[in-house]
C-alpha cells in the first residue's frame, strides 16, 4: 500500500475551478485551466505554496474530485522549482485552507466528507462561513447593516410578484428609503464574484422568470442603492484589518467586482471613511468571530448611509498580473495568511 503524504496544510478547490492531479490528460500541466478567468491562479497559488515551503510549512493543492475522506485526498498538486507537479498518491492534512463552496449537493457532500472528523479543521470559522455563504442568512443576522433582502421561493411569475411585493413593503418601512432607486437587483443567493447579478426596472417580472428558469439557481431581491458605483472592502485576519481597497465599476455597469470589469485600487486604512470603520466595528461585535480570514464589502449611498454588500470568508488572494502594486499587495496578504497557517499548524514562522 502506498504511503500517505502528510501535509501541514491542504488547499482545496472545487473541480469546476481546478483540474484534479489525477487526470489522465497529458496536456494538463497546471491545476487551473488556461483560457479561463481562473488561469492566473496558477501564479497566485504557486506563490502561496512557495511561501509555505520557504517557511517549513508543507503544503499541497487538491480538488473536490479528489476528496476521499476526512482531510484526505487521492491526488494533489505540488509547486516546486517554478513548476506544477501532479502527484497521484494519497495526501492528508488536519488543516484545510478551504476554497470549496457547497453550491450544489455534490459539493456539499464532498465538503461534509472533508470535514467529517473533528481532527480536521478549516482555516476559516464554519459559522462565519455559513453566515456569509447564504445572502439571505447574512441579511437575517445583520439586517441593521444591510439593504432589504427577500428570497424568491420558486422560479415562477407568482413567486417573483410575491417577493417584489414583500420587498416594496420593506423599502417603504425602511428609515432610509430615499437611498433606494426604483430598480431592483436580483442576485444568486449563494453566488460570488458578481456572477449571476442582474438589474431590473419595475414590471420586468417576465425577464426575471426567464433568467431564473434558465439558471436553476436560488435568487434574492434587493433594492438598487443609489451610490457612486464604488465599493469598499476591508480584509480582516486574526481580528485586525490587514488590507483595504476600493473597487470601481466599469462604465455602464453597477457591479464593482474585478471579475465583471471593475477596477481595484488599494488604499490606506486612513483613507477609508471613518463612518465605514465605525460601522464595521459595530458589525464585528455582533459576529464575534474574528480569529479568521474574512472580508466585508460596503457601499456608501448618495445620502451618506452605509450598507453592507456582503461578507466573504474566502476573499480573493489573486491579483491583476499587469498591475505591480496589486501584485505586491496580494503577495503581502498571502504572506500574512501563511504566517497564520503556520501558527495554527504550530510551525515556527520565518517570514
Where are these regions (language model features)?
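A short glycine-rich, hydrophobically flanked beta-strand micro-motif that places a catalytic Asp/Glu
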Residues: 60-64, 222-223, 232, 291-303
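Structural motif
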Residues: 8, 94-95, 307
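Extreme N-terminal starter segment of soluble prokaryotic enzymes
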Residues: 3-10
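Conserved N-proximal alpha/beta basic substrate-recognition cap immediately N-terminal to
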Residues: 38-154
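Phosphate-binding site of ATP-dependent enzymes
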Residues: 180-183, 190-271
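A solvent-exposed, charged loop/short amphipathic helix patch at secondary-structure junctions
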Residues: 18-42, 257-263
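C-terminal active-site "lid" helix and adjoining low-complexity regulatory extension at the edge
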Residues: 267-278, 285-291, 300-351
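Active-site nucleotide/adenylate-binding loops and adjacent lid/helix of ATP-dependent enzymes
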Residues: 2, 113-121, 126-219
Amino acid at each position: 500500500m502506498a504511503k500517505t503524504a502528510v501535509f501541514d496544510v491542504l488547499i482545496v478547490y472545487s473541480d469546476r475551478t481546478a483540474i484534479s492531479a489525477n487526470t489522465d490528460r497529458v496536456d494538463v500541466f497546471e491545476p487551473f485551466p488556461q483560457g479561463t478567468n481562473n488561469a492566473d491562479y496558477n501564479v497566485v497559488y504557486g506563490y502561496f505554496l512557495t511561501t509555505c515551503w520557504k517557511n517549513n510549512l508543507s503544503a499541497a493543492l487538491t480538488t473536490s474530485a479528489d476528496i476521499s475522506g476526512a482531510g484526505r485526498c487521492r491526488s494533489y498538486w505540488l509547486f516546486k522549482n517554478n513548476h506544477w507537479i501532479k502527484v497521484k498518491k494519497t495526501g492528508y492534512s488536519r488543516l484545510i485552507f478551504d476554497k470549496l463552496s457547497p453550491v450544489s449537493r455534490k459539493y456539499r457532500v464532498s465538503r461534509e466528507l472533508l470535514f467529517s472528523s473533528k481532527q480536521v479543521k478549516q482555516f476559516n470559522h464554519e459559522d462565519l462561513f455559513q453566515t456569509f455563504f447564504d445572502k439571505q442568512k447574512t441579511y437575517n443576522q445583520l439586517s441593521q447593516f444591510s439593504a432589504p433582502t427577500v428570497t424568491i421561493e420558486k422560479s415562477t411569475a407568482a413567486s417573483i410578484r410575491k417577493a417584489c411585493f414583500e420587498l416594496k413593503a420593506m423599502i417603504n418601512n425602511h428609515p432610509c428609503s430615499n437611498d433606494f432607486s426604483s430598480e431592483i437587483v436580483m442576485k444568486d443567493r449563494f453566488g460570488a464574484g458578481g456572477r449571476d447579478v442582474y438589474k431590473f426596472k419595475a414590471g420586468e417580472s417576465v425577464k426575471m422568470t426567464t433568467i431564473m428558469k434558465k439558471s436553476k439557481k436560488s435568487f434574492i431581491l434587493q433594492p438598487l442603492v443609489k451610490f457612486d458605483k464604488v465599493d469598499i472592502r476591508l480584509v480582516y485576519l486574526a481580528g485586525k484589518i490587514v488590507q483595504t481597497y476600493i473597487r470601481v465599476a466599469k462604465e455602464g455597469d453597477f457591479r464593482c467586482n474585478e471579475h465583471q470589469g471593475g477596477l481595484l485600487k488599494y488604499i490606506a486604512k486612513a483613507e477609508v471613511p471613518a463612518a465605514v470603520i465605525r460601522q464595521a466595528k459595530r458589525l464585528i461585535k455582533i459576529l464575534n468571530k474574528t480569529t479568521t480570514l474574512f472580508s466585508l464589502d460596503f457601499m456608501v449611498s448618495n445620502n451618506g448611509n452605509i450598507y453592507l454588500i456582503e461578507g466573504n470568508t474566502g476573499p480573493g488572494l489573486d491579483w491583476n498580473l499587469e498591475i505591480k502594486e496589486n501584485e505586491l499587495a496580494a503577495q503581502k496578504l498571502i504572506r500574512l495568511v501563511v504566517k497564520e497557517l503556520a501558527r495554527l499548524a504550530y510551525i515556527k514562522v520565518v517570514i
